[in-house]
């Protein structure tokens, strides 16, 4: 899954570089505030793609003495930085540009250039969104989109999905702003569109920050995975029950499991050791993402006289 996420990030970043260039050229030629905001948006998305790739690379490093559980949470940290970047740079600068245009409106020049650039941008963003959506769809496990995002453990993937969705919405708003400004000679519409684009970025950033924060502070594994792990433990003939089943997501594809397993009263030590080994082996075979397994043994003493 990590390789697919990286491919989606690379596709989005490459597209954003090309889009940013043509948007800024169009903004310079036409004086469009909305197009300038879209250029800022694409530059921010390009930088964010680089940050996500940096996070994926650092998160893939093996465990060491200082980080015995690995570096998988690096991805969560850099996703939070991306959210702050979208909020502060993307949303803030777009709104500033729009408000400045509202205070000092100016008529559009060469609006046809804007239409051509917006059409090209839609093509590039749609291709990027298609790659991200296909990757996301394979990981959603039949859940509704919003639920799949909430339960998702790979922020690099849903970050790109957020960015591409916000980009397509922003392009639509920019088109409406340019069209109204052009047809009705209303330059204020162009500035208003820039403010709306900024608000879209702020909302996307806040949502992304919320999801990244939850993962960064230590989120449990997917409920379906937890239930499946419980089934594996209970399926062993020596196990009579379970105590606490604690999980934590250590990275997009890494899970820590701490499980209390209850055995038959008076079970011999050798039988318990074999059962623990079987459970660990079955978990490793079925769920390779569960990289850290800690089994706590609970054996009530045998009843007196037995």
Model-based region annotation:
Residues 1-223:
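Alpha-helical transmembrane cores and adjacent cytosolic helix/loop segments
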């Amino acid at each position: 899954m990590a390789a697919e996420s990286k491919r989606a990030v690379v596709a989005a970043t490459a597209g954003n570089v090309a889009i940013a260039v043509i948007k800024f050229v169009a903004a310079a030629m036409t004086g469009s505030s909305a197009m300038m905001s879209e250029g800022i948006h694409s530059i921010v998305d390009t930088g964010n793609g680089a940050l996500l790739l940096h996070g994926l690379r650092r998160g893939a490093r093996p465990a060491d003495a200082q980080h015995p559980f690995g570096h998988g949470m690096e991805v969560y940290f850099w996703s939070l930085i991306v959210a702050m970047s979208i909020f502060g740079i993307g949303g803030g600068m777009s709104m500033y540009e729009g408000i400045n245009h509202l205070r000092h409106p100016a008529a559009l020049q060469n609006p046809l250039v804007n239409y051509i650039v917006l059409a090209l941008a839609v093509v590039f963003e749609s291709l990027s969104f298609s790659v991200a959506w296909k990757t996301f769809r394979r990981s959603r496990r039949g859940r509704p989109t919003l639920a799949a995002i909430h339960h998702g453990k790979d922020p690099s993937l849903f970050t790109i999905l957020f960015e591409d969705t916000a980009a397509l919405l922003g392009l639509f708003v920019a088109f409406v702003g340019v069209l109204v400004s052009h047809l009705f000679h209303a330059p204020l519409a162009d500035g208003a569109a820039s403010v709306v684009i900024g608000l879209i970025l702020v909302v996307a950033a806040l949502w992304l920050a919320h999801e990244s924060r939850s993962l960064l502070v230590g989120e449990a594994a997917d409920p379906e995975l937890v239930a499946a792990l419980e089934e594996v433990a209970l399926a062993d003939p020596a196990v009579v029950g379970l105590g606490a089943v604690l999980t934590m997501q250590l990275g997009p594809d890494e899970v820590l499991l701490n499980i209390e397993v209850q055995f038959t009263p008076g079970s011999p030590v050798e039988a318990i050791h074999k059962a623990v080994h079987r459970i660990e082996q079955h978990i490793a075979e079925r769920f390779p993402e569960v990289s850290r397994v800690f089994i706590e043994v609970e054996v009530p003493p045998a009843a007196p006289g037995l």
